[in-house]
Amino acid sequence: MRVKPMFGATFTDIAIWIYYPFNGPTKIRFGLLNYQLPHIGEHIGDWKHVTLRVNNFNGELQSIYFSQHKGGTWLDATDLEFQEGNKAAVYASRYGHAFYSKPGLVLDGRDGIGLRNDCEKDDLYLDTGASYTLVATEYLGSANVEPPWLNYRREWGPTVNHILKDEIDEILKVIPKPLRGHFRKFFYKLPREILEEEGPSSIKTKVNWDGDEI
């Protein structure tokens, strides 16, 4: 957990970072058809986070930022689902771990073509308020003690090289010919983190570590 003042201490941002050991392969939707890609999107290690923005004047939750594959989304507290009183519910997508405020399918694309983000409600969940570690609270001065791993600046996982063209060609074999050109264009517009099988960078090197969420 990383806590920092924002906008002249008008708000306090509480960023909750979660490390996933493995990111699974991507699944895409093409009209009424769904395709599970064999390897694309896989990589060892995956950092994702949600940020709670608290109003320092009244101590109330103002909004939550849900990190996703490319950037993320801010939602006002009035648009969130709460459980057990004041605990906001966050849903992680299957394999990709993109965060959303409700279960169901979110299609990352347009015109019925895109990356599937499937979320489901389950009895198994992670209560981040029950067990957490404060890793960065610079405003506390000398009381701020960072764990050694926080300053590890290299990738949190190996780089695995696959020949993307070969994988695309295999998928094109099962896609109707009139749709193949559209699929190829869509494929190369996927976020970089989906196409590359590379471990994630250190969370401390990310732009939003010190600044606002973008």
Residue ranges with predicted function:
Residues 4-15, 21-214:
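Domain-length functional cores that host ligand/cofactor binding and catalytic or interaction surfaces
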